[in-house]
UniProtKB/Swiss-Prot annotation:
GO CC entries: endosome membrane; Golgi membrane
Name this protein carries in UniProt: Leptin receptor gene-related protein
UniProt cross-references to Pfam families, sorted A to Z: Vps55 (PF04133)
Function: Negatively regulates leptin receptor (LEPR) cell surface expression, and thus decreases response to leptin. Negatively regulates growth hormone (GH) receptor cell surface expression in liver. May play a role in liver resistance to GH during periods of reduced nutrient availability.
Highest taxon listed in the record's lineage: Eukaryota
Keywords noted in UniProt: Endosome, Golgi apparatus, Membrane, Transmembrane, Transmembrane helix
Membrane topology: Multi-pass membrane protein
Subunit description: Interacts with LEPR. Interacts with RAB13.
GO biological process: negative regulation of growth hormone receptor signaling pathway; negative regulation of protein localization to cell surface; negative regulation of receptor signaling pathway via JAK-STAT
Organism: Mus musculus (Mouse)
InterPro entries xref list: Vps55/LEPROT
Subcellular location: Golgi apparatus membrane; Endosome membrane
Tissue specificity comment: Widely distributed in the brain, with elevated expression in the hypothalamic regions, including the paraventricular nucleus. In the placenta, present at high levels in the junctional zone situated towards the maternal aspect and throughout the labyrinth zone in close proximity to the developing fetus.
Main location: Golgi
Length: 131
């Protein structure tokens, strides 16, 4: 039952993050949909971790070059997701209020993604058996 509660909490927080993102795009004062490009970063952020989890067989090692490279790429993706709205606001493509809403949505969504991996990524194999 704890897995179901965690899944409901994660889906609720994901919905809140996407609501912030949509508010940053669809409110009448802002009305520009360029910030939706951060959805691409949401999709590709876990991919380096998936690849490193599949390729790395030695789970007892304290450090793995593949795992460290995956952390590096994931960090670059997350920083890019936070940087894109700031750059768009700086060049006056979007307004600063929309930038703030998108940044709040980014924080909530990335914490949700991290929470998902902390809750459901504990298994030895890669099957997400707690679902």
């Amino acid at each position: 039952m704890a897995g179901v509660k965690a899944l409901v909490a994660l889906s609720f927080s994901g919905a809140i993050g996407l609501t912030f993102l949509m508010l940053g795009c669809a409110l009448e004062d802002y009305g520009v949909y360029w910030p939706l490009f951060v959805l691409i970063f949401y999709v590709i952020s876990p991919i380096p971790y998936f690849i490193a989890k599949r390729v790395t067989y030695d789970s007892d090692a304290t450090s793995s070059a593949c795992r460290e490279l995956a952390y590096f790429f994931t960090t670059g993706i997350v920083v890019s997701a936070f940087g894109l709205p700031v750059v768009l606001a700086r060049v006056d493509v979007i307004k600063w209020g929309a930038c703030g809403l998108v940044l709040a949505g980014n924080a909530v969504i990335f914490l949700t993604i991290q929470g998902f991996f902390l809750v459901f990524g504990r298994g030895d194999d890669f099957s997400w058996e707690q679902w």
